[in-house]
Amino acid sequence: MVKPEKFIPKAVEKISKEIKDGRAIIALSGGVDSSVCAELAHRAIGGRLQPIYIDTGLMRKGETERIKHIFSHMNLDIVYAKDRFLAALKGITDPEEKRKAIGETFIRVFEEEARKLEADYLIQGTIYPDRIESEGGIKSHHNVGGLPSVMDFKKIVEPIEDLYKDEVREVAWALKLPDEICERMPFPGPGLAVRILGEVTEEKLEVAREANSIVEEELLDRFCPWQTFAAVIGKGTGVKGDIRAYGWIIAVRAVGSRDGMTAEALELPWDVLKKLESRITSEIPKVARVVYDITPKPPATIEFE
């Protein structure tokens, strides 16, 4: 287990040595990983750090506004790139190809922003499980295996690449980051794109966004899952108002875990599952069916893609 009082000064020193007197941008998502990196980097290089948040169009409901509010004290640069990411994903159905398309687009946007700022370094919040899954061929993370082979940066700096998620939270508490950040549930870097099986479309994104919002409203505060979400996994036949309906199938996932390397599905009460089904199918007319995924990790991964 990490000892924050020892880790923090070492990480700050490492960032200072790697960036020297250069300028850096940091990929800030608002999650605990990137937020910890931002605080460490700010302590290391101060005003030579520029945090950048990219609105990919693949975010949860209200995500960009939430980020603006939380980081209003910082000189946060927000880049709106929805059209660019959707164009990069058009026609792609394979999950690995989707992750790589997202990783490539992320890097190209960051390169463009870095050139404007004359920044030569990119700081990002890669953690140890990201590396394990990418290097082990389980799935490419957009910030590891999903990155292009040629990048216009002197170096990518990853201050917390050897930490597990629970260790990152310990460091976040020690850095006195806001509770909302320290306790924030993990959200994948590729966003809702990996909660949509097959090609990403505007319609699927809207369905996934609304379904995820409902699931979080119903489960987060009451059951405190390590992670919970909804995924669009295909289409199926249903009946609405005595009329045949061919609509989307939503899979709900809620798991408990310590570090994300293994996970168990939560045994949710039947009345809770019924309420989830009722809300999702009534509030999202294009949904015909709701299922609950009870598969642990392994053999499954937490996210569907």
Swiss-Prot record:
Which range is the signal sequence, renumbered to this chain?
Answer: none
The record's disulfide annotation reads none
The reply on keyword Ligase is yes
* Record EC number: 6.3.5.2
Q: Per the database record, which ranges form the GMPS ATP-PPase domain?
A: 2-184
- InterPro entries this protein is in? GMP_synth_C, GMP_synthase_B, GMPS_ATP_PPase_dom, Rossmann-like_a/b/a_fold
- List the catalytic activities from the record: XMP + L-glutamine + ATP + H2O = GMP + L-glutamate + AMP + diphosphate + 2 H(+)
Q: Which GO terms describe its cellular component?
A: cytosol
Q: Which residues bind ATP?
A: 29-35
Q: Listed GO molecular functions?
A: ATP binding; GMP synthase activity
Protein role = Catalyzes the synthesis of GMP from XMP.
Which PANTHER family does this UniProt record tie to the protein? GMP SYNTHASE [GLUTAMINE-HYDROLYZING] (PTHR11922:SF2), GMP SYNTHASE-RELATED (PTHR11922)
Q: What is this protein called?
A: GMP synthase [glutamine-hydrolyzing] subunit B
